[in-house]
Amino acid sequence: KVQDLLLLDVTPLSLGLETAGGVMTVLIPRNTTIPTKKEQVFSTYSDKEPGVLIQVFEGERTRTRDNNLLGKFELSGIPPAPRDVPQITVCFDIDANWCLNVSAEDKTTGQKNKITITNDKGRLSKEDIEKMVQEVEKYKAEDEEVKKKVDTKNALENYAYSMRNTITDDKITSKLPTEDKKKIEDTVDGAISRLDGNQLPEVEEFEDKMKELESLCNPIIAKMYQGVLAQMVLVLLIMADAPTGSGGAGPKIGEVD
């Protein structure tokens, strides 16, 4: 008896795009059955960034430079905003004919752009694919170290910029002593300056800088919020102790619109 067999096409390599630190963020993992469609939301890397470059890669390595570039396009017209604020939806859509459509859309404006990548242009050969898959284990330790460095760097960067945005908020700076604000500014500027360097230091250096930032900033910010909370509690206590006006008296003048 001959049994019916269902043959499924799968992606030979992972598909993704380049994100901060030159690493590949995978949207469609290797061996995913096609057709398939995946979406993920990304944001900008710098303040007031007017556009982003979407670079599409296939491969299994952590760094995009070790993978194969399939194509790229720009999404422009993003309104000026602090980093991490814009919401950009990226969609990878592979049809049954191996045609890969990659689109990006800014949620705020509806601005969008896309690229279509066919299976016969710029793709790796069967031999190259097999070689790349075999290299995954060979470079596993190296790739894990790179990813750890980039993740630690990104965490420090996010915290530093978050603190910078915090101390430039007028609602917050009005409650922050000038001396404390200056301390945070100097430490944050020093961290960002180090991050902007071309070198990728060891993980320990990023972790030490993060501890330095947190040990300085967290107590100052916590103290400020405690002061604000104390003021709110005081106001509530005063309101609770105030006469309620019960006893038949009508509304006082000025209380009626």
UniProtKB/Swiss-Prot annotation:
GO MF annotations, alphabetized: ATP binding; ATP-dependent protein folding chaperone
Alphabetically ordered keywords of this record: ATP-binding, Nucleotide-binding, Stress response
Domain of life per record: Eukaryota
Pfam family of the protein (one): HSP70
Keyword flag Nucleotide-binding: yes
SUPFAM superfamilies with a match to the protein in the record: Heat shock protein 70kD (HSP70), C-terminal subdomain, Heat shock protein 70kD (HSP70), peptide-binding domain
Disulfide bonds: none
InterPro entries: HSP70_C_sf, HSP70_peptide-bd_sf, Hsp_70_fam
Family: Belongs to the heat shock protein 70 family.
Record's protein name: Heat shock 70 kDa protein
Organism of origin: Lupinus polyphyllus
